[in-house]
Amino acid sequence: MHPSAMRNCKSFFEVYASKMEGGTVLDIGSQDVNGSLREVTPKQFKYVGVDFEKAKNVDVVLDSPYIFPFADEAADILITSSCLEHSEFFWLTWLEMLRVVKPTGLIYVNVPSEGQYHAYPVDCWRFKLNAGHALQKWGKRAGFNPLLLEAYTDAEPPWHDSVAVFVKEWDNHSLYPDRINTDEL
Protein backbone atom coordinates (compact mmCIF):
# COMPACT_ATOMS: atom_id res chain seq x y z
CA MET A 1 0.00 0.00 0.00
CA HIS A 2 1.54 3.30 -1.00
CA PRO A 3 1.96 6.05 1.64
CA SER A 4 -0.73 8.40 0.30
CA ALA A 5 -3.28 5.55 0.36
CA MET A 6 -2.48 4.89 4.01
CA ARG A 7 -2.66 8.60 4.85
CA ASN A 8 -5.98 9.14 3.07
CA CYS A 9 -7.63 6.14 4.75
CA LYS A 10 -6.31 7.21 8.14
CA SER A 11 -7.88 10.64 7.54
CA PHE A 12 -11.15 8.93 6.58
CA PHE A 13 -11.27 7.07 9.89
CA GLU A 14 -10.31 10.17 11.88
CA VAL A 15 -13.06 12.29 10.30
CA TYR A 16 -15.88 9.80 9.78
CA ALA A 17 -15.42 7.04 12.36
CA SER A 18 -13.95 8.78 15.39
CA LYS A 19 -17.37 9.11 17.06
CA MET A 20 -18.48 5.56 16.24
CA GLU A 21 -18.35 3.05 19.07
CA GLY A 22 -17.32 0.21 16.81
CA GLY A 23 -18.70 -2.18 14.25
CA THR A 24 -17.45 -4.24 11.34
CA VAL A 25 -15.06 -2.91 8.70
CA LEU A 26 -14.71 -4.87 5.47
CA ASP A 27 -11.53 -4.13 3.50
CA ILE A 28 -11.98 -5.23 -0.11
CA GLY A 29 -8.59 -5.92 -1.70
CA SER A 30 -6.88 -6.32 1.67
CA GLN A 31 -3.77 -8.25 0.65
CA ASP A 32 -0.74 -6.75 2.38
CA VAL A 33 1.48 -5.32 -0.36
CA ASN A 34 3.86 -2.97 1.47
CA GLY A 35 1.33 -2.31 4.23
CA SER A 36 -2.33 -2.77 5.02
CA LEU A 37 -5.29 -0.58 5.93
CA ARG A 38 -5.65 -2.77 9.04
CA GLU A 39 -2.82 -0.61 10.43
CA VAL A 40 -4.98 2.56 10.30
CA THR A 41 -8.33 0.98 11.26
CA PRO A 42 -9.30 2.11 14.78
CA LYS A 43 -9.14 -0.62 17.41
CA GLN A 44 -12.85 -0.38 18.30
CA PHE A 45 -13.72 -1.92 14.92
CA LYS A 46 -13.65 -5.55 13.89
CA TYR A 47 -11.52 -5.56 10.73
CA VAL A 48 -12.14 -8.22 8.08
CA GLY A 49 -9.67 -8.40 5.20
CA VAL A 50 -11.18 -9.65 1.94
CA ASP A 51 -9.35 -10.59 -1.27
CA PHE A 52 -9.54 -13.14 -4.06
CA GLU A 53 -6.41 -15.05 -3.07
CA LYS A 54 -5.00 -16.38 0.17
CA ALA A 55 -2.28 -14.02 1.33
CA LYS A 56 -1.03 -11.98 4.26
CA ASN A 57 -3.85 -9.88 5.80
CA VAL A 58 -6.64 -11.81 4.02
CA ASP A 59 -9.30 -13.20 6.38
CA VAL A 60 -11.89 -14.10 3.72
CA VAL A 61 -10.93 -15.42 0.27
CA LEU A 62 -13.47 -14.67 -2.45
CA ASP A 63 -14.49 -17.26 -5.02
CA SER A 64 -15.52 -14.35 -7.26
CA PRO A 65 -14.59 -10.67 -6.95
CA TYR A 66 -18.19 -9.88 -7.92
CA ILE A 67 -20.01 -11.93 -5.26
CA PHE A 68 -19.21 -11.28 -1.59
CA PRO A 69 -19.96 -14.06 0.94
CA PHE A 70 -21.66 -11.69 3.38
CA ALA A 71 -25.29 -11.09 4.26
CA ASP A 72 -27.05 -7.94 3.13
CA GLU A 73 -26.22 -4.98 5.38
CA ALA A 74 -23.49 -6.87 7.29
CA ALA A 75 -20.87 -4.10 7.49
CA ASP A 76 -20.78 -0.71 9.17
CA ILE A 77 -17.91 0.49 7.00
CA LEU A 78 -16.45 -0.81 3.77
CA ILE A 79 -13.04 0.39 2.63
CA THR A 80 -11.20 -0.32 -0.58
CA SER A 81 -7.92 1.19 -1.67
CA SER A 82 -5.76 0.42 -4.69
CA CYS A 83 -8.16 -2.36 -5.65
CA LEU A 84 -10.83 -1.27 -8.13
CA GLU A 85 -8.27 -0.49 -10.82
CA HIS A 86 -7.58 -4.24 -10.79
CA SER A 87 -11.24 -5.23 -11.15
CA GLU A 88 -12.22 -5.89 -14.75
CA PHE A 89 -15.86 -5.12 -13.90
CA PHE A 90 -15.54 -2.67 -11.00
CA TRP A 91 -19.18 -1.63 -11.40
CA LEU A 92 -20.24 -5.13 -10.31
CA THR A 93 -17.91 -4.96 -7.32
CA TRP A 94 -19.43 -1.55 -6.47
CA LEU A 95 -22.95 -3.01 -6.35
CA GLU A 96 -21.78 -5.76 -3.99
CA MET A 97 -20.22 -3.09 -1.78
CA LEU A 98 -23.56 -1.31 -1.59
CA ARG A 99 -25.39 -4.55 -0.85
CA VAL A 100 -23.27 -5.53 2.17
CA VAL A 101 -23.16 -2.13 3.90
CA LYS A 102 -25.77 -1.11 6.47
CA PRO A 103 -28.11 1.79 5.56
CA THR A 104 -26.17 4.11 7.89
CA GLY A 105 -22.88 2.65 6.69
CA LEU A 106 -19.98 4.28 4.90
CA ILE A 107 -18.03 3.27 1.83
CA TYR A 108 -14.50 4.60 1.31
CA VAL A 109 -13.06 4.22 -2.20
CA ASN A 110 -9.48 5.10 -3.16
CA VAL A 111 -8.29 4.43 -6.72
CA PRO A 112 -5.24 5.91 -8.46
CA SER A 113 -6.00 8.66 -10.94
CA GLU A 114 -2.49 8.36 -12.41
CA GLY A 115 0.59 6.17 -12.04
CA GLN A 116 2.39 3.36 -13.78
CA TYR A 117 0.91 0.07 -14.91
CA HIS A 118 0.88 -2.43 -12.04
CA ALA A 119 -0.90 -5.71 -12.73
CA TYR A 120 -2.23 -7.64 -9.71
CA PRO A 121 -3.18 -9.63 -11.89
CA VAL A 122 -4.53 -6.92 -14.24
CA ASP A 123 -4.53 -3.10 -14.24
CA CYS A 124 -7.58 -1.80 -16.11
CA TRP A 125 -8.67 1.59 -14.77
CA ARG A 126 -7.84 4.98 -13.32
CA PHE A 127 -10.52 7.08 -11.56
CA LYS A 128 -10.85 10.83 -11.93
CA LEU A 129 -12.71 13.34 -9.76
CA ASN A 130 -16.11 12.62 -11.33
CA ALA A 131 -15.86 8.86 -10.72
CA GLY A 132 -17.64 9.24 -7.38
CA HIS A 133 -20.62 10.91 -9.05
CA ALA A 134 -20.73 8.12 -11.63
CA LEU A 135 -20.67 5.44 -8.90
CA GLN A 136 -23.51 7.22 -7.11
CA LYS A 137 -25.57 7.24 -10.32
CA TRP A 138 -24.80 3.58 -11.03
CA GLY A 139 -25.89 2.66 -7.50
CA LYS A 140 -29.18 4.52 -7.95
CA ARG A 141 -29.77 2.86 -11.31
CA ALA A 142 -29.40 -0.52 -9.56
CA GLY A 143 -31.98 0.36 -6.89
CA PHE A 144 -29.74 1.67 -4.11
CA ASN A 145 -29.77 5.24 -2.79
CA PRO A 146 -26.13 6.16 -2.06
CA LEU A 147 -24.92 9.69 -1.52
CA LEU A 148 -21.43 10.87 -2.38
CA LEU A 149 -20.36 12.80 0.72
CA GLU A 150 -17.08 13.98 -0.72
CA ALA A 151 -14.57 13.37 -3.48
CA TYR A 152 -11.09 14.72 -4.03
CA THR A 153 -7.84 14.00 -5.84
CA ASP A 154 -4.76 13.78 -3.66
CA ALA A 155 -1.88 15.94 -4.89
CA GLU A 156 0.86 13.43 -3.99
CA PRO A 157 2.56 11.78 -7.00
CA PRO A 158 2.81 9.33 -8.58
CA TRP A 159 -0.71 7.97 -7.92
CA HIS A 160 -2.71 11.14 -7.22
CA ASP A 161 -5.30 9.07 -5.36
CA SER A 162 -8.91 9.64 -6.34
CA VAL A 163 -10.85 9.40 -3.07
CA ALA A 164 -14.62 9.16 -2.68
CA VAL A 165 -16.68 8.70 0.49
CA PHE A 166 -20.30 7.56 0.39
CA VAL A 167 -23.10 6.91 2.84
CA LYS A 168 -25.22 3.98 1.66
CA GLU A 169 -28.59 5.67 2.17
CA TRP A 170 -29.03 9.31 1.18
CA ASP A 171 -31.37 9.91 4.15
CA ASN A 172 -28.52 9.22 6.59
CA HIS A 173 -26.14 11.90 5.32
CA SER A 174 -26.72 14.14 8.37
CA LEU A 175 -24.93 11.54 10.52
CA TYR A 176 -21.68 12.61 8.85
CA PRO A 177 -21.36 16.42 8.81
CA ASP A 178 -17.54 16.57 8.77
CA ARG A 179 -15.28 16.23 5.72
CA ILE A 180 -11.65 15.31 5.05
CA ASN A 181 -11.34 17.87 2.28
CA THR A 182 -13.26 21.10 2.70
CA ASP A 183 -13.17 21.94 -1.01
CA GLU A 184 -16.55 21.68 -2.72
CA LEU A 185 -17.44 18.67 -4.87
PLM region spans:
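A short SAM/SAH-binding and catalytic strip from SAM-dependent methyltransferases
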Residues: 76-88
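Generic anion/oxyanion-binding catalytic loop in active/binding sites
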Residues: 64, 79-82, 121
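Charge-dense, low-complexity intrinsically disordered segments
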Residues: 3, 84, 126
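Conserved N-terminal segment of class I S-adenosyl-L-methionine
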Residues: 1-73, 77, 163, 174-185
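S-adenosyl-L-methionine-dependent methyltransferase catalytic module, highlighting the catalytic core
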Residues: 88-185
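Beta-hairpin (beta-strand-turn-beta-strand) motif
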Residues: 63, 83, 112-114
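Redox-cofactor binding/interface segments in oxidoreductases and associated redox assembly factors
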Residues: 27, 80, 109
